[in-house]
């Protein structure tokens, strides 16, 4: 019997690492930027039936993915939100829990396409049941979606992003209708203007709401590469009046009336709007996160970057009620990644504790057993603004721990996630391989009991089926089942029925964007995901030119189809791809083939395998759609 417990920790891949916190692995392939948020959320509904965490990321093959951790049922699922996307870490997904507990996921390309994409779970709290992908058109290119719902206007979604003129932008959306469609019913509008909208000016903004009537934002004059003195400003939008105000409530502008408030990194601007400027030190300042957990004392996590960009320093910037107070936290080295003279303003990263904004987590270089490696530290600041304590959390890591993010707090323990590994660039190109990082967490990871022999009705590990070799496989009739196989579809005939059974048909639709489908009875459901990846970007010049390079067809992929409790679930290379409700199915006959290609390693079970078991089968064989 092949039985085991599946629970991957960082120590499995980095056996010499020790830490003061638990270090587990969410995924070995994932990354994010730090301006599209929330990149992860935790949600518990009022009735107590949902208590989930959702963590989103993108891999170097352009797969936008998310992990769902069900803390009540001790279950973890990894979902393929979108395949064949621009392989760029700016494109990580962001999450919004709707009033009916369904989860809405936004994503967009990096500033070279005028639209957003989104998908909504069909079941409350469960992103393994995502509906179809919907495109939301905009007039201007988009990046960094940050969605909110506020109690003063519970019937709308407020979406903030970098949009019009590369500036902070806001719009109000209708709630999803029965077809999951939303529309803009106010905006999009540019929120503010920097340096009169001059060429190349692009403020970087972080947003947070009070959950009621305000969306707070802190933003820079521009990218810190562009000028050596880069101010950081702090405002809020009153959603009832649409007014942009400073921290004391002074009106700066009315969003949407055509007159923009213009900011400048100058003494004249600060003299005119003294409390709107949160940081004016003579550095290439950048920001990582804001907190309005205490609305009267908002906090900004700031990094000061030297003129030559070689020295980074972390600060807590906090409003005291009368002024913005700066507290030094730590020297933070220089740029964290492996590529010299590129993105030298990329610090290891900071995150503010969700429950206690006096605590900030930072990634800083530390000398250890493996040389200078970025480790996580915890900084605590007193109410008076002095650094009370510094605590190192990870030790002797082989690879850098970077871009931390705190999801929520369970008692005194934050749910934290971060990237770990080598990083070369924010985009995959012929010049560099991108961001070959993993996602780690201090949360406990649910474990599946793995037994890939239990319930096995048929196995043909060395056998091959093809379009001319349609051999019927008869099995004892079962109303629960799993079919698993390694599939290789001829690239010149990339279509056809792949598996035909007495319960359903699974196939691949041809065309420039080939997508799988499953048909049970009269109901046919086509996947939102192309059966292909974005490896074509590896041959292209670095940049964001708006191109959709043709999907690269895998040499083979692992297909798993499970059925239980009236639900078909389809997994591609171990990731949830499709969810289809189909009552009353029963399996007794399987016909592999019906396409030009081969099928190997066929396994049929009389039960629905867990995703942990499916990933165990996937790891037994090589695959190229979602792995390197």
Show which residues each predicted segment covers.
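Extracellular, repeat-based ectodomains that mediate carbohydrate processing or recognition
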Residues: 14-450
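Beta-strand-rich interaction surfaces with strong enrichment in secreted/lumenal proteins
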Residues: 82-83, 93, 277, 470-474, ...
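Extracellular carbohydrate recognition
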Residues: 225-231, 569-571, 591-599, 611
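Extended recognition patches within non-cytosolic domains
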Residues: 450-461, 575, 601-628
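Extracellular glycan-recognition modules
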Residues: 451, 463-532, 567-568, 604-617
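Short, aromatic/His-centered strand-loop micro-motif at the edge of beta-sheets
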Residues: 519-558
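Localized edge beta-strand/strand-to-loop motifs within extracellular or lumenal beta-rich domains
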Residues: 555-569
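Flexible glycan-contacting loops in extracellular carbohydrate-active proteins
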Residues: 576-600
């Amino acid at each position: 019997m092949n039985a085991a417990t599946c629970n991957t920790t960082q120590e499995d891949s980095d056996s010499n690492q020790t830490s003061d916190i638990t270090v587990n692995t969410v995924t070995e392939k994932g990354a994010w930027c730090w301006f599209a948020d929330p990149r992860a959320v935790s949600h518990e509904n009022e009735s107590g039936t949902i208590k989930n965490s959702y963590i989103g990321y993108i891999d170097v093959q352009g797969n936008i993915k998310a992990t769902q951790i069900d803390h009540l049922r001790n279950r973890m699922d990894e979902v393929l939100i979108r395949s064949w996307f621009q392989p760029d870490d700016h494109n990580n997904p962001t999450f919004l829990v709707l009033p009916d507990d369904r989860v809405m996921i936004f994503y967009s390309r990096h500033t070279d396409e005028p639209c957003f994409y989104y998908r909504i779970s069909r079941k409350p709290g469960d992103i393994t049941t995502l509906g179809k992908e919907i495109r939301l058109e905009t007039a201007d290119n988009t990046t960094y979606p940050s969605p909110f719902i506020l109690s003063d206007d519970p019937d709308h979604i407020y979406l903030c992003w970098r949009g019009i003129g590369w500036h902070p932008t806001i719009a109000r959306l209708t709630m999803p209708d029965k077809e999951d469609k939303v529309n803009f019913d106010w905006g999009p509008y540019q929120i503010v203007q920097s340096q009169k909208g001059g060429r190349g000016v692009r403020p970087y903004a972080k947003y947070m709401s009070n959950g009621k009537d305000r969306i707070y934002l802190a933003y820079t004059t521009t990218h810190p590469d562009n000028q050596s003195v880069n101010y950081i400003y702090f405002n809020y939008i009153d959603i009832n009046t649409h007014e942009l105000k400073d921290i004391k409530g002074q009106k700066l502008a009315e969003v949407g009336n055509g007159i923009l408030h213009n900011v400048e990194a100058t003494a004249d601007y600060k003299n005119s709007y003294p409390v709107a400027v949160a940081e004016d030190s003579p550095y290439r300042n950048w920001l990582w996160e804001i907190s309005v957990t205490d609305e009267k004392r908002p906090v900004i996590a700031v990094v000061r970057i030297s003129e030559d960009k070689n020295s980074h320093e972390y600060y807590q910037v906090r409003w005291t009620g009368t002024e913005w107070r700066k507290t030094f936290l730590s020297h933070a080295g220089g740029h964290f990644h492996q590529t010299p003279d590129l993105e030298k303003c990329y610090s290891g990263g900071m995150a503010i504790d969700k429950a206690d904004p006096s605590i900030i987590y930072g990634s800083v270089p530390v000398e250890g057993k493996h040389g200078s490696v970025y480790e996580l530290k915890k900084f605590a600041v007193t109410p008076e603004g002095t650094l009370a304590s510094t605590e190192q959390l990870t030790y002797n890591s082989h690879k850098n721990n970077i871009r931390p993010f705190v999801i929520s707090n369970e008692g005194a323990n934050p749910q934290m996630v971060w990237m770990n590994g080598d990083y070369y660039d924010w985009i995959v190109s012929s010049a560099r391989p991108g961001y070959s990082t993993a996602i780690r967490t201090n949360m406990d990871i649910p474990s599946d009991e793995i037994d890939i022999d239990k319930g096995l009705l048929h196995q043909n590990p060395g056998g091959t089926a093809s379009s001319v070799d349609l051999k019927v496989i008869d099995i004892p009739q079962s109303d629960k089942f799993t079919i698993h196989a390694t599939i290789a579809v001829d690239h010149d005939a990339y279509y056809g029925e792949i598996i035909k059974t007495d319960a359903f048909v699974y196939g691949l639709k041809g065309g420039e964007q080939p997508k799988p489908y499953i048909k049970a009875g009269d109901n046919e459901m086509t996947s939102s995901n192309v059966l292909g990846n974005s490896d074509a970007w590896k041959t292209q010049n670095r940049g964001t030119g708006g191109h959709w390079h043709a999907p690269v067809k895998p040499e083979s992929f692992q297909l798993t189809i499970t059925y239980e409790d009236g639900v078909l679930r389809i997994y591609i290379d171990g990731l949830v791809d499709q969810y289809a409700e189909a009552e009353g199915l029963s399996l007794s006959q399987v016909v592999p083939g019906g396409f030009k290609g081969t099928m190997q390693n066929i396994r049929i079970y009389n039960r629905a395998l867990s995703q942990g078991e499916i990933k165990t089968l996937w790891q037994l064989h090589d695959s190229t759609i979602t792995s390197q």
